[in-house]
Structure formats: structure tokens, C-alpha cells
């Protein structure tokens, strides 16, 4: 499933990465200035023309709790050579450190690419000694010198965007450099540092996730009244540092369960770090988007799924959903929303008997089981979905009670305890995905869900909490390796046509296995829930259709409150403005679009239901592209977090979304030219919510006045650009035989007008929707096939063709030709 790394320049011919924004940014196409110091083998990376390197660093390895630095080695050898990947050449430095008595040798491979503002580095530990060594971490960046990550302006103007261990461990917050908890900004997977004065930025991002997590740390020390970066390092390491933090699953665990990662490297063997991208630019949006696209190509990301629109149970019922309420909501969705495109029906946690026993329903709430009910959901024309936490096992589950040997253990042979389901109820443990018995359990569970219950979409949660270091059945296994093993088994079991959604999990490790991925924390029936989730949705915008299709969590727009869920259940109903905030936040993600309200409650409120039926918002989701957070790193202090999002839907049409996250009235003046629109253009601007025109005395700017807790969504049409229907091209077989399953695919014929979806008419009374569809004709004939590309504002394009079908379906009994069907293992 994963692709071995072999260079990254070939993955940059991407078409249009995104809208080119004028946000004090310049093109970031210049190659970096890379050098290896002959005196000590350290490396420097900077931008052309700069008087100093932005980064000067060595490498290191942690062995048995102590750090060994490259500067300690008495010998180093530097070799350079041109290397080639699929498209471009690169210059590679190979720097080998040796001669330190009793210690393994260290080597780093550093590549720089022509015309690309990035480099990449990987460290290799070679055990040249006569005895095994135990490796805990490999450090690819150990910054040295007095000027660390200097962006040519006062460090007090730096802002730091640190990705986190998972979508909400912890919640993402963009910090000023001085706002460093315990003197450190820690990121997992990636970290962006941007200076608001120089507009320069440096970005570090993990390119691989083969064995380790990548942890980045910016250490901050005061310098008079101004902060400065005193140290910076990037490690390939285990998860224990993260799981033992205040939000981690081992925060309250016994010392025996807090195992540091220790990988044994035999004499003569090698161990590699993860590969790390280093990028420097004056366009941080481009840095993030380029990184996302590289990840998509390297890991064969599954990003082709159509955007799901539907309903989920969690914020409507939490643990309280039962059979009757589920069927009522399914019937309501089918009768009132399916015709608009809402057809996913997702049952979240609460249906199962125990975590770790997902194919056994709780008879108290689902007395007739789930198989029959999910068939009813399917018969309503809905897509059934289910929640699981694949690698968590509770003490009530069959696995824990019958096979504790299938669990991850500590050094004393006891299962590692990772907390409780809620409030010290139901202790949790970790499934060992390297154990053959546990692997068979996974196959049986997910085969039952898919083949027995008919599930077509599966959410996989709490993979962050279960990613612990420990003693696995397969020795020398890391938490990341074990997780990938489990994901591989699940994907092989369910097949390619079942949709998998990464919920609680690290970001990079599941890429290539999952179709969807949660990008921020849980939402709910409060404005605070939307506000807290918004920064994560903004910060990870570039992951949408690069890592996976984004899952922003469900929106809530009704007046429903859930009194016994104090966190996000809401003590008072959402105001109309707050309801608009919730649904607009989902729309700007460009990802999954799920209703989180009890549907009959929503249906009793026509004004709230109208939000769910708003075509412009639905089109933002169906288009599948994220709105760019224009002020991601430049938001005003008065706003407190990114507030302005831009989606260029077509050369003619743009959507501008402006949030007010504060508790007071806010006013923004948005220059249309700053959005990449012609300064002297003629525009028709309307409000997406009420469809009324927006007038402005200044045609070059848009004044946005907002009350507290509100959002404005504007549709901006450049009237100088003519409206066009999308152009579509159908790919198909030239002919077929009766009974033969034929494949049909539709593609945009150009990039001018966007396409929301494709609708097929096969000429025999059957129609389907989708980019790739199959159909079989039952009799010979020449059929007129048509595919319609649905565009914005009802403008549609089409392609048609004649398809000759010959022969007939044999009705003879031919037992010699029969073949026994075998399902996936």
C-alpha cells in the first residue's frame, strides 16, 4: 500500500495547486542554498541572497537514554553526487560519521533540487560495533549556532503552526513565538514558522511514516523583552512522549505501562529515520500545498471518493441512539433529504456491546441486531455507515476476557492499560495487530460488518490512544508499524469499494489506506465547539484530497440541546448566526458534509432546515476543494484565529467566507484584488444565506460588518467572464456483449468550469450517478448513452455516444462451467 521513497520532484507537476493569493507572498520557486561544512560535517540551508543560513544543524542518535551527536565523531567523509528521480535531477550530499569508540556510525543523505525551494534529509544508523545497540530516537535536525531559524526580522514577529499528534491531541492553536508552553512549541508531523514582518517562512514536514512518528520542537528563551529561538530539533521517535502528555492515553498510566521505544539494531545492521522535507519561502500557502501534493503521490493517497453528504448519530444522540430513533432518522432523511444528495447514514458509538466487540450489538438498544436494520437503511436508498475503534479493547469484550494474549503488553507481561471509555467506566487496552489471533479477529469483525451487515462506510476512531509502544508479538515493532499492519488487514478485508474514515489518529500514518480523515476536534451544539474546531480545519486545509478527503466532523444547525453532554451538548440552543457558523465551517473544509442534528427536530424548524438545503453551501462541499484560509498565519490579534476563507470555484465565481469568532462586533475590509481578482473588474456580489445582492460604494473592496458569533458568506461573480457549462468527456468500451459488465468513466474535458457530479443515462431505462460506474445490458441493440456533467448554478454539459451490444445471455444449464465463490479472507 505504501510507496518506497525514491525522490520527490516528480510529484510537483500538479496542475493548479490552488488559487494564487496576494497575501504579501511571492513565488517560491528558487532553489535553496545548501552547504555541508567541511570542518565538522554539519549542514546549512538558506535562501538565495540571504546573508546567513536559516538552518545550521548536525544529526544525532539516542542510545540507551543518552544522546550521541555527530560533532562527537572524530572522522567524517563528505561525498556529493547527482541523483535522478522520475523527472528531475538533484544534488545529494552523503555525509558519514565514524570512529567513535563503541558507537554506531551515523550517515545523513541530504538532497537539494533545482528550481524548488526545498530539500530533504534522512539519517541512517549503521551498527558497526560487535554488539547490538538499542535506538530510541534518531535526530535529523539538531540546530546549532546563535541564530536559529532566523527569518530576517525580529523573532517576536514569528508565528508557529505545529501540527499535533492527532486531530485533537492536542487541539491545534496557532501561537505567537512568545506564547510557548513551558518554553517549547512541539509539533508532530510538521511545523511551520512564519514571520509577519519579513513574510518569510520555514516549513518542516515528514515525508514518510514507516516506523516512527516525527516530533519537532522549537525551544524559546526570552532575550530582554523579546523571545528568541534557543534550540530546534526534529526526531524520528516513538509515541511515549506524546501518549504521556496531559491529553495522552498514558497520562495517568502506571510507570510499567509507559515504555520508551527501544529498537534493537544488530551488529552490521542499519536503521533509518523518516525522511524530512525542509522548505523555505515567502509563500507559506504554497509550501503547505506542495507538501500535501507530495504526500498524495508518495503514499498513493485514496482521494477520489465523491464528497459524502448525509447524517450521523453522535451529536444527535451520543451513547443514546436506539433502533427506533435510528430508523426514524433514516426514514426522515430518505423522504426529505435524499433527493438533494444527502444519502449517507452513519451510526456512531453506542450500538456495540463493548469496544473491541463491534460485530456484537447491544441488545438493550438494538434488540433485533444491526444486520436487518442496515438492510432497511439500504432499501431506503441510503449508504449505511458504522463507527469502530479498531485497535481498542475494553475489559467487557470477548477478546479481553478470552484472549489477553492478543493485547500489547508491558515488560511484566501484563496488558497495557490506556484509560477508560468514560469517567473511569470500562478499562481499555490495545489490540496487538502483529498477533495472528488478533489479525484473524480483525478480519472476522470487519468481514461481518461489510458482508453480513452491508456496511459501506466505516469510521475508525481512537487510533491515537491505541498507538502505544510496548511488547508486541512481532519483536522490534513500533506503534506506527503495528497500526499500519492493522490498517492493511482491514483494507484487505473490506476491499477497495468500502470507504474508510480515519478519525482519532496521527495524520500521515493512515494515508493510502483510508478514504477520509478527521482534521479537527469534535463539533457539537455550541458555538464554542465550532470555534475550537475552526483552527484545525484551517491549518489542515491542504490535506483535503492530498492526504485523504477531509472529515471536518458534523455540523449542527437546529435548536437541539443535549443536556447530559455538557462538553458540546449545549446548555442553550444555537442562535441563527451560530447555526450558520457551524454549517459554513463544514462547507469551507471542502470535505464531508454531515448533519449532526436529530432530523425530526430539524424538520420542525423551516429556517434551520433551509440552511441544510442551501445549494451554494452544498456545492462548496460537492466541489471537493477546500477554501484557502487567507489569514492562516496573518490573522489580526483582534480576531484571535484565522477568519477569512476563499474558494475560487471557477474563473467566473468565487466564494468568500468571513467568520467573527469573537464576542464583540467586528469589521473587515477585504480588498478584492487581494483575493486574486482583477482590481478593475465588475462584480455581482450576493449573500449566500439570503441570496440578496450586496451593495458597496467602493467597488474595489468589500466591507464586512458582523455581530459576535457570526459568519458572512459571499458569492462573487466576475461579470466580465462569460458563464460556461462544463465540458465532459466519456471514456467507454467501443462495444459490449449482453450480460457483460462494462465500465464507464467521465472526466473534465477542460479546467474552465467545475463539475459537481456526473449523471449517466444508459439508454435502457437505467441511470446512475458517479465518476466511474458499471452497467450491463440484458439484450442486444445499439444504445444511446449520455453523461451529464452537473455544473454550478444549473449549467450542465454533456457527452453522448452510441454503444453497440451484441449476443444474448445463455439460459442453458452448464455445471462444468460453474465456479465456487470465495470471499476475501
Feature roles, as predicted:
Residues 26-236:
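Polysaccharide-binding surfaces and accessory modules of carbohydrate-active proteins
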Residues 586-589, 594, 635-677, 709, ...:
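Carbohydrate-binding surface patches
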Residues 696-725:
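C-terminal beta-strand-rich structural cap/linker in extracellular carbohydrate-active enzymes
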Amino acid at each position: 500500500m505504501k510507496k518506497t521513497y525514491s525522490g520527490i520532484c516528480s510529484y510537483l507537476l500538479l496542475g493548479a495547486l490552488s488559487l494564487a493569493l496576494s497575501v504579501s507572498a511571492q513565488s517560491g520557486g528558487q532553489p535553496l542554498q545548501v552547504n555541508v561544512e567541511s570542518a565538522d560535517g554539519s549542514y546549512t540551508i538558506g535562501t538565495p541572497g540571504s546573508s546567513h543560513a536559516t538552518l545550521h544543524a548536525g544529526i544525532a542518535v539516542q542510545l540507551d537514554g543518552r544522546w550521541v551527536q555527530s560533532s562527537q565523531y572524530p572522522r567524517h567523509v563528505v561525498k556529493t553526487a547527482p541523483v535522478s528521480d522520475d523527472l528531475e535531477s538533484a544534488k545529494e550530499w552523503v555525509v558519514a560519521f565514524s570512529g567513535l569508540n563503541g558507537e554506531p556510525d551515523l550517515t545523513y543523505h541530504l538532497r537539494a533540487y533545482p528550481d524548488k525551494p526545498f530539500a530533504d534529509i534522512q539519517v541512517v544508523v549503521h551498527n558497526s560495533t560487535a554488539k547490538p545497540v538499542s535506538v530510541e530516537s534518531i535526530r535529523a535536525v539538531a540546530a546549532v549556532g546563535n541564530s536559529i531559524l532566523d527569518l530576517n526580522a525580529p523573532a517576536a514577529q514569528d508565528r508557529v503552526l505545529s501540527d499535533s499528534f492527532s486531530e485533537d491531541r492536542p487541539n491545534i492553536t496557532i501561537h505567537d513565538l512568545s506564547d510557548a508552553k513551558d518554553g517549547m512549541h512541539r509539533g508532530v508531523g510538521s511545523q511551520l514558522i512564519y514571520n509577519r514582518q519579513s513574510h518569510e517562512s520555514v516549513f518542516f514536514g515528514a515525508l514518510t511514516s514507516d516506523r516512527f512518528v516525527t516530533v519537532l520542537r522549537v525551544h524559546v528563551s526570552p532575550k530582554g523583552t523579546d523571545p528568541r529561538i534557543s534550540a530546534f530539533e526534529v526526531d524520528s521517535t516513538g509515541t511515549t512522549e506524546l501518549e504521556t502528555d496531559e491529553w495522552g492515553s498514558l497520562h495517568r498510566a502506571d510507570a510499567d505501562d509507559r515504555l520508551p521505544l527501544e529498537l534493537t539494531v544488530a551488529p552490521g545492521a542499519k536503521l533509518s529515520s523518516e525522511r524530512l522535507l525542509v522548505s523555505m519561502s515567502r509563500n507559506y500557502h504554497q509550501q503547505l500545498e506542495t507538501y500535501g501534493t507530495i504526500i498524495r503521490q508518495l503514499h498513493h493517497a485514496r482521494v477520489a471518493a465523491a464528497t459524502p453528504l448525509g447524517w450521523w448519530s453522535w451529536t444527535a444522540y451520543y451513547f443514546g441512539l436506539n433502533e427506533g430513533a435510528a430508523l426514524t432518522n433514516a426514514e426522515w432523511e430518505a423522504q426529505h433529504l435524499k433527493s438533494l444528495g444527502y444519502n449517507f447514514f452513519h451510526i456512531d458509538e453506542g450500538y456495540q456491546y463493548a469496544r473491541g466487540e463491534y460485530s456484537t450489538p447491544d441488545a438493550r438498544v438494538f434488540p433485533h441486531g444491526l444486520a436487518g436494520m442496515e438492510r432497511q437503511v439500504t432499501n431506503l436508498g441510503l449508504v449505511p455507515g458504522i463507527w469502530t475503534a479498531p485497535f481498542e479493547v475494553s475489559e467487557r469484550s470477548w477478546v479481553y476476557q478470552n484472549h489477553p494474549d492478543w493485547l500489547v503488553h508491558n515488560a511484566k507481561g501484563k496488558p497495557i492499560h490506556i484509560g477508560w471509555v468514560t469517567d473511569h467506566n470500562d478499562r481499555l487496552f490495545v489490540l496487538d495487530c502483529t498477533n495472528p489471533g488478533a489479525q484473524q479477529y480483525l478480519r472476522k469483525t470487519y468481514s461481518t460488518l461489510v458482508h453480513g451487515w452491508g456496511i459501506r462506510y466505516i469510521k475508525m476512531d481512537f487510533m491515537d490512544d491505541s498507538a502505544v509502544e510496548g511488547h508486541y508479538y512481532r519483536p522490534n515493532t513500533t506503534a506506527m508499524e503495528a497500526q499500519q499492519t492493522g490498517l492493511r488487514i482491514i483494507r484487505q478485508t473490506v476491499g477497495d469499494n468500502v470507504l474508510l474514515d480515519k478519525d482519532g489518529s496521527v495524520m500521515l500514518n493512515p494515508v493510502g489506506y483510508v478514504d477520509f480523515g478527521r482534521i479537527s476536534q469534535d463539533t457539537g451544539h455550541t458555538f464554542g465547539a465550532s470555534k475550537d474546531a475552526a483552527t484545525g480545519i484551517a491549518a489542515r486545509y491542504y490535506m483535503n484530497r492530498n492526504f485523504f478527503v477531509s472529515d471536518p466532523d458534523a455540523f449542527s444547525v437546529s435548536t437541539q440541546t443535549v443536556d447530559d453532554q455538557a462538553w458540546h451538548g449545549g446548555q442553550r440552543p444555537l442562535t441563527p448566526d451560530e447555526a450558520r457558523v457551524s454549517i459554513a465551517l463544514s462547507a469551507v473544509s471542502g470535505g464531508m458534509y454531515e448533519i449532526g442534528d436529530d432530523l425530526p427536530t430539524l424538520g420542525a424548524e423551516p429556517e434551520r432546515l433551509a440552511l441544510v438545503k442551501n445549494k451554494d453551501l452544498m456545492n462548496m462541499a460537492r466541489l471537493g476543494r477546500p477554501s484557502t484560509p487567507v489569514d492562516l498565519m496573518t490573522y489580526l490579534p483582534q480576531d484571535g484565529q484565522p477568519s477569512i476563507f476563499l474558494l475560487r470555484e471557477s474563473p467566473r465565481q468565487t466564494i468568500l467566507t468571513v467568520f467573527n469568532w469573537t464576542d464583540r462586533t467586528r469589521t473587515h475590509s477585504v480588498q478584492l484584488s487581494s483575493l486574486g481578482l482583477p482590481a478593475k473588474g465588475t462584480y455581482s456580489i450576493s449573500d449566500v444565506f439570503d441570496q440578496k445582492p450586496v451593495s458597496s460604494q467602493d467597488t474595489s473592496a468589500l466591507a464586512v460588518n458582523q455581530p459576535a458569533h457570526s459568519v458572512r458568506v459571499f458569492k462573487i461573480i466576475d461579470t466580465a467572464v462569460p458563464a460556461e457549462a462544463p465540458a465532459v468527456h466519456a471514456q467507454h468500451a467501443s462495444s459490449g456483449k449482453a450480460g457483460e459488465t462494462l465500465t464507464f468513466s467521465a472526466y473534465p474535458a477542460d479546467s474552465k468550469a467545475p463539475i459537481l457530479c456526473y449523471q449517466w443515462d444508459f439508454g435502457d431505462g437505467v441511470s446512475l450517478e458517479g465518476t466511474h460506474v458499471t452497467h450491463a445490458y440484458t439484450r442486444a441493440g445499439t444504445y444511446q448513452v449520455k453523461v451529464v456533467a452537473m455544473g454550478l448554478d444549473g449549467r450542465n454539459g454533456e457527452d453522448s455516444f452510441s454503444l453497440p451490444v451484441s449476443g444474448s445471455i445463455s439460459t442453458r444449464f452448464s455445471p462444468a462451467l460453474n465456479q465456487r465463490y470465495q470471499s476475501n479472507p
